[in-house]
Amino acid sequence: MKKAVWLTALAGATALALSACGAAPEESTGGESNAASDFKPCIVSDAGGFDDKSFNQLSFEGASAAADELGTELVDVQSTTESDYKGNVESLVAEGCNAIVTVGFALSATTIESATANPDIDYIIIDDAADADFDGQADAENIKPLLYDTAQAAFLAGYLAAGYSEAGKVGTFGGMDFPTVTIFMDGFKQGIDYYNETKGENVELVGWDGK
């Protein structure tokens, strides 16, 4: 029960980018309290770290809020390079974590490997389906992918930016050429295109052509 509430709160916090939305835990008996104290949630970042002002940071803030709500302590470990991923996840397994959040598609292979080897641990991966064999399901039953259609939020941003612009020109830029990055810019462009179509305008997008 505690684990389910924590997962719900984590998902809500990541999606809203501000706060956990899980229900507050009910007053518990001594036995339930002991069960809660045995629950150890953990999180590992990708190479961006938890101060990236993006999905690593938002995931960390969501997991922290959920852990606080449940009265438990979040164990976190940051990666600085891709070579850190496997060792960091293994360290959380050794730490006795019951649930491990892996942030970003770059940790997909490591998550699948660790989840397969540790079926009693729950894994939550952010922004990846953990579906290496493309059968429409995560490659281990104990993996819960959290995927969000971020193009929808970017669409609204593009539409509003186009309406706000006095110069008739708006810009966007991304980091590396990854699908989880370009999806933001795709949605932004679609919002501008929709604004132009419905308002009869010709606001120009600089920095991304959708290709």
Show which residues each predicted segment covers:
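C-terminal motif of bacterial Sec signal peptides marking the signal peptidase cleavage site
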Residues: 15-20
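A residue-level marker of the well-folded mature domains of exported/periplasmic proteins
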Residues: 23-211
